[in-house]
Amino acid sequence: MQVGDLVRSPSEPYLGIGIIIETRSRNHKIKWLNPKWGCSWAGPGRRILELVA
């Protein structure tokens, strides 16, 4: 996964789709397209992500 990829969190479907805006090591900062959720971090031990085709 890299900056600009569209992702979603299968364990938290209410978050919807997000875009990776920053990557540090194996952690990714996600800007959620739903303005209600803002930004959050994902990575090992945090939030599971999968790419949106």
Task: Tell what function each PLM region has.
Residues Q2-A53:
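Basic/aromatic-rich interaction segments and small domains that mediate binding to polyanionic partners
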